[in-house]
Amino acid sequence: EFLVQNDLTKSTMKLVDETEFKKLLSNLTIEETVAGGSVANSIVGLSQLGNKVSFIGKVSDDELGNKYEQSLVNEKVTYFYNKKKEDTPTGTCLILITPDSERTMCTFLGIAGKINEQDINEEAIKKSDLVFLEGYLWDEGEPKSAFEKAFKIANKTAMSLSDKFCVERHKDSFLDLVKNKLDITFANEQEILHLIGANSFDEVLEFGKDLGKLLVITRSDKGSVAIHKNEVFECESQKNLKLVDLTGAGDLFAAGFLHGHINNMSIQESLEKGTEMASKIIQKIGARLN
């Protein structure tokens, strides 16, 4: 009922401004406040698996920004950003969990939406095996220049398409990225169907084979699929799980898969590691494992 009243589509992410965000908050009781962010969740997962990782993002020198930075320090993530007092506050995401464990997100990007190429640490990217980006940030102007700078410097790039509506808004740009710039693309089934205008998953498989790069797709209870050149790899989802909160399922899946990829595991083993990580996170509240 709350979703309908506030024009929210279940299981998606809606961008809101600060006024709308505060209005939504005024009608709710907040159960818990935790650090998040799609790629940040993946990076923390990678750190917990023993990888050396760093994160480039943007927060303000305010209460939430300081908590956010400390959460990364606690997880042994090197954070490249000199935060300072800003008029724009740290970004915030309101996550609504319905009884079926689905999550619906309302995001006020705050200063995160103002990340620009000056915020990109060139040395950090040059030293990295791989740079992982999120499609969510394509929703604002300045981050595109930050993305472009990262693409030019990176040794290898991966990106999550993030959200079905995100794909709809930036279809041409995303398709160009997937075809011409990214080495690895992560998407769920709905996102990839929307991206290529497909009516069936068979069309997705054909697209993936023609792509010639690594395309990794999560299919909820149907498991996951990775397509690389002419090969298709599949992994079943884990059964009999106690679903609590689907927030971060894709983020932690990406963490597990990338852990396998950068540690020279096979594509099949990487899918299995991604499935294992996603299965753990959906059985708890929030998008980070303890």
Tell what function each PLM region has.
Residues E1-S54, N66:
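Glycine-rich phosphate/adenosyl-contacting loop at the front of the ribokinase-like
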Residues L15, T19, E63-Q70, E272-G286:
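Short, conserved aromatic-histidine micro-motifs
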Residues G37-S42, L64, P89-G91, A254:
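Short glycine/serine/threonine-rich phosphate/pyrophosphate-binding segments
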Residues Q48, D210, L214, D221, ...:
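Conserved post-catalytic alpha-helical subdomain immediately downstream of the catalytic base
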Residues I56, C235-E236:
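Hydrophobic residues at beta-strand termini and immediately following loops
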Residues K58-S60:
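Alpha-helical transmembrane segments within multi-pass membrane transporters and channels
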